[in-house]
Swiss-Prot record:
Belongs to the argininosuccinate synthase family. Type 1 subfamily. This is Argininosuccinate synthase. Keywords: Amino-acid biosynthesis, Arginine biosynthesis, ATP-binding, Cytoplasm, Ligase, Nucleotide-binding. One of its GO terms (cellular component) is cytoplasm. Pathway: Amino-acid biosynthesis; L-arginine biosynthesis; L-arginine from L-ornithine and carbamoyl phosphate: step 2/3. Its EC number is 6.3.4.5. The gene is argG. Homotetramer. L-citrulline binds at residues 86, 122, 126, 174, 183, 259, 271.
Length: 409
């Protein structure tokens, strides 16, 4: 009887390398899948390491373009910030990784998929809910959650089975990175009072070390999609990576956040999202210029729900396409250029222009060129305030009647 096949989300790190051997010992043929979503991973090294450790097959996928266009872009257009701070760096990549795991499982005839998440984090939920939504017939395995070893026990298992141990194993932090940013937790960061050491950061410089001269960038959008940076056209994923470099050297995008995890605990996380935070700010400013008041005031309701949906692992739920349909409709006129000054940790929008601009200078000006009909304000104010006026009149009358009644009684 042939062995069962399992498709493993493989990073090349200690946990998933040990998982290959552990799953093999459990009787599975392991197929490793590694994705590059913008963290600069050496895909060939990851592929070869998986085979060396014991995988029967190893797939590597450069998914930066798909990640940026299908997952990051909707989050940008939704200004998706969980709890108004976190740009959903890791949460956005999980549905894409799940999608690729399921696709390869179906191609190879695998009966199961596996991930390297612990039993304490959000990612286990994101992976398993996504996989169940895409193919309910696949079994989902979580080796790290199941074996529940200490770090020392895991290292001992690796040594015993000749599994290569990463040279950065002494790094106290748990890091996840993609083109939308970098997340960092554990070590001293677990103390919410402790100042994050500079060694916890990689994409951004400290404000004290940032240049003393600002840098101006111009970001061009077409229907809500960032397409140019300083006049040069880029694919979305390349534009984000380029902006990470530019904004990061000015200390833009550091976020220190105590967040409410999906599993019920609070967690202190440190994020670096220079490109993401710059783009979100620029995109919103362009929307302020091109969206009507009603759309601009309602959109944050949808944005909050989209952020929660992504964070909570519900990308493939029925609600997501419904929210996306609204989002897509709002972007039809979000075309133009935004000028941003990057300086000492800040991304400051200094200018915006669009052929769809709803800003009319002749209506807004206080100069002699003013074309606003001031006399129209009289009737508008009367009608606008009428409900409040009527309410006040009625209640004043009722109060007077009540006072007279109390005097005579």
């Amino acid at each position: 009887m042939s062995k069962k096949k399992v498709v493993l989300a493989y990073s090349g790190g200690l946990d998933t390398s040990v998982a290959i051997k552990w799953l093999s010992d459990k009787g599975y043929d392991v197929i490793a899948v590694g994705l590059d979503v913008g963290e600069g991973k050496d895909l060939e090294f990851v592929k070869e390491k998986a085979l060396k450790v014991g995988a029967i097959e190893s797939y590597t996928i450069d998914a930066k373009k798909e990640f940026a266009e299908e997952f990051v872009l909707p989050a940008l257009q939704a200004h998706a910030l969980y709890e108004q701070k976190y740009p959903l760096v890791s949460a956005l990549s999980r549905p894409l990784i799940s999608k690729k795991l399921v696709e390869i499982a179906e191609q190879t005839g695998a009966q199961a998929v596996a991930h390297g998440c612990t039993g304490k984090g959000n990612d286990q939920v994101r992976f398993e809910v996504s996989i169940q939504a895409l193919n309910p017939n696949l079994e989902v395995l979580a080796p790290v959650r199941e074996w529940a070893w200490s770090r020392d026990e895991e290292i001992e298992y690796a040594k015993k089975n000749n599994i290569p141990i990463p040279i950065d194993l002494d790094n106290p932090y748990s890091v996840d990175q993609n083109l939308w940013g970098r997340s960092n937790e554990c070590g001293i960061l677990e103390d919410p009072w402790a100042t994050p050491p500079e060694g916890a950061y990689e994409l951004t410089v400290a404000i004290e070390d940032a240049p003393d001269q600002p840098e101006i960038v111009e970001i061009g959008f077409e229907k809500g999609i960032p397409v140019t940076l300083n006049g040069k056209s880029y694919p979305v994923h390349e534009l984000i990576l380029e902006l990470n470099q530019i904004a990061g050297k000015h200390g833009v995008g550091r976020i220190d956040h105590v967040e409410n995890r999906l599993v019920g605990i609070k967690s202190r996380e440190v994020y670096e999202c220079p490109g993401a935070m710059t783009l979100i700010k620029a995109h919103k400013e362009l929307e302020d210029l091109t969206l009507t008041k009603e759309v601009a005031h309602f959109k944050p309701v949808v944005e909050k729900k989209i952020a929660e949906l992504i964070y909570e692992g519900l990308w493939f739920s029925p609600l997501q396409p419904a929210l996306s349909a609204f989002l897509k409709e709002t972007q039809s006129t979000v075309t133009g250029v935004v000028r941003v000054k990057l300086f000492k940790g800040h991304a400051i929008v200094e200018g915006r222009k669009s052929e769809y601009s709803l800003y009319n200078e002749k209506l807004a000006t206080y100069t002699p060129d003013d074309e606003f009909d001031h006399n129209a304000a009289v009737g508008f104010i009367s009608l606008w305030g009428l409900p409040t006026k009527v309410y006040s009149m009625v209640n004043k009358e009722m109060k007077e009647k009540q006072e007279k009644k109390e005097v005579t009684s």
